[in-house]
């Protein structure tokens, strides 16, 4: 994995989050992906389970919920790459309404491992809410 490929993947990740398109989300991840929303959570395993979680279709502990359209944005950048491992940082912003002011900002760190097709096979998210 190189820096350009990592940035392309991160941009696709943000795009998939904004679209909530099943195929776009699935294309990011290896079939046997291990995905953690928090480092100490039990992982979500497998691309189908990750997609269901992103789409708010899963009731598994730690699963995601769908955000309202146009109420969030994010920018992530790779900061370290070692072979197939990428560490990225960035921030995520949320608004209560699409036209409203930013009400929450989170600083993020992703630790990811990729396969030969640049699909993520391990994903762990760390984040903290800005004060």
Language-model regions: role of each:
Residues 81-94:
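A short hydrophobic beta-strand element
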Residues 74, 88-90, 108-110:
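Hydrophobic residues positioned within well-ordered beta-strands of beta-sheet architectures
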Residues 94-104:
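Short, cysteine-centered beta-strand-loop-beta hairpins and adjacent loop/turn segments enriched
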